[in-house]
């Protein structure tokens, strides 16, 4: 875990790359990353970035309201799978096992004042077509209820996980991923669609011309990876597109 001084250095290092938006991530344990700790990180980030997004554990509306006051604008929650039976087999303990609480996190974030929310299933955990459909309907229904809210989709699929070679994705290859992204674009034409660095350069270069509206750049998934020579903790997943912010910018311009 980074302290306030280390967070400041990390934010400075990221801002120096030219990025104007930042995503703050934590694990699923409030004991490791309290709401107050995340709020402090948001206050620091606000000095350097125009938009602050959160990928953190689900919270109550009052906690989202506090983080919004600290500077957070956007909340993304990965439902992982919308198959509640499958979900139970993946989460045997802790707060994350409560399926409805996670499912309703985006609405609580909107009620807490967040200007936008993001949706995603981890494609490949279960039937990816059913999960993609459920993700789309989840976002659509919230958009109807809260028309002022900005809606975004992320499209992660199971990829190689560091220190784990037993994951067996259920056939979510690039053609299927493209189909899902295009379906989101047609179904909700004003939604944002983000493609992460888990996907390869070629796919990201092409999808930005077809349907995606946002791609990450200069990503380092190690804790303190932008500002420290020796990162704290392990990386979570492998990066397929390791290009810098300048390289991504040049690709988009070209």
Task: Give the residues covered by each predicted segment.
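Core AdoMet radical
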Residues: 1-10, 14-109, 115-119, 125, ...
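Alpha-helix N-cap and loop-to-helix initiation/capping positions
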Residues: 2, 33, 37, 93-101, ...
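A general structural detector for well-ordered alpha-helical segments in enzyme core domains, enriched
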Residues: 7-10, 37-41, 63, 101-105, ...
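Amphipathic, soluble alpha/beta structural segments
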Residues: 21, 38, 42, 46, ...
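Catalytic cores of alpha/beta
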Residues: 60-69, 115, 125-141, 200-210
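Short alpha-helix boundary/capping motifs
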Residues: 73-74, 95-96, 137, 212-213, ...
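Auxiliary Fe-S-binding modules of radical SAM enzymes
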Residues: 133, 143-254
């Amino acid at each position: 875990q980074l302290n306030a001084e280390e967070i400041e250095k990390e934010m400075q290092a990221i801002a120096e790359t030219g990025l104007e938006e930042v995503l703050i991530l934590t694990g699923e344990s409030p004991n490791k990353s309290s709401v107050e700790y995340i709020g402090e990180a948001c206050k620091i980030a606000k000095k350097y970035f125009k938009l602050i997004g959160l990928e953190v554990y689900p919270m109550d509306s009052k906690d989202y309201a506090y983080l919004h006051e600290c500077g957070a604008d956007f909340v993304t929650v990965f439902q992982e799978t919308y198959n509640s039976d499958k979900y139970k087999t993946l989460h045997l303990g802790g707060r994350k096992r409560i399926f409805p609480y996670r499912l309703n996190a985006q609405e609580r974030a909107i009620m807490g004042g967040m200007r936008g929310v993001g949706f995603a299933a981890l494609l490949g955990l279960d039937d990816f077509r059913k999960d993609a459909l459920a993700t789309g309907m989840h976002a659509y229904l919230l958009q109807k209820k809260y028309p002022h809210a900005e809606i975004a989709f992320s499209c992660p699929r199971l990829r190689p996980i560091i220190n784990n070679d037993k994951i067996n994705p259920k056939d979510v290859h690039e053609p299927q991923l493209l189909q899902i992204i295009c379906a989101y674009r047609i179904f909700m034409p004003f939604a944002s669609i983000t493609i992460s660095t888990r996907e390869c350069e070629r796919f990201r270069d092409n999808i930005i011309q077809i349907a995606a509206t946002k791609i990450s750049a200069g990503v380092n998934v190690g804790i303190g990876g932008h500002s420290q020579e020796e990162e704290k903790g392990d990386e979570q997943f492998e990066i397929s597109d390791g290009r810098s912010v300048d390289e991504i910018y040049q690709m988009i311009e070209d």
